[in-house]
């Protein structure tokens, strides 16, 4: 909301609620139609979509477009975590509870590290006075937040590459 210069109430309602609604719709949709859709295709779409939405939210000068991108990010990421559990359980059907514990710990670590590094980039852009160098409109804080969001687009790309590797491994096992 600060990065897009929106009032707090409007930002909370549109951003958090929109993200949550789209997250729920994505998971519900996969629950209904998942038997007809490859989880790897869903995760590829989700990774590419999340990356695109992060970039759109970061570079959009229009607050409405930025908020729409934040909401649609919820749809894009909705199946990334559950999808990783589906892929792991199909690849290692006898792994048991320890696999899910490791996946949970890895997911928590990834969520924490992603937020941490995004915050580092945001703080560095603001502290080093790079906002005027970057030439974006807005306050130094807004430019720094947008820069951090732009940096965060790398994480869904990492998810995409891992998913493509796992898909290739699954195809080799099937042949």
Give the location of each predicted region.
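Intracellular juxtamembrane helix-capping segments at the cytosolic ends
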Residues: 79-92
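Loop-to-transmembrane helix entry
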Residues: 3-22, 98, 102, 144-150
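Multi-pass alpha-helical transporter architecture, strongest
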Residues: 150-175
């Amino acid at each position: 909301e600060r990065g897009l210069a929106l009032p707090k109430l409007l930002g909370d309602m549109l951003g958090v609620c929109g993200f949550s609604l789209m997250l729920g719709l994505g998971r519900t949709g996969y629950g209904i139609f998942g038997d007809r859709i490859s989880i790897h295709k869903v995760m590829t779409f989700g990774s590419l979509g999340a990356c695109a939405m992060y970039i759109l939210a970061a570079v959009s000068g229009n607050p409405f477009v930025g908020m729409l991108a934040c909401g649609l990010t919820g749809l894009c990421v909705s199946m990334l975590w559950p999808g990783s559990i589906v892929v792991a359980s199909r690849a290692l059907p006898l792994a048991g509870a320890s696999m899910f514990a490791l996946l949970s710990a890895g997911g928590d670590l990834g969520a924490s590290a992603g937020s941490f590094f995004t915050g580092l980039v945001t703080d560095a852009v603001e502290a080093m006075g790079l906002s005027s160098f970057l030439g974006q409109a807005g306050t130094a804080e807004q430019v720094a937040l947008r820069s951090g969001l732009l940096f965060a687009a790398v994480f869904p790309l990492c998810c995409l590459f891992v998913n493509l590797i796992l898909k290739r491994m699954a195809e080799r096992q099937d042949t």
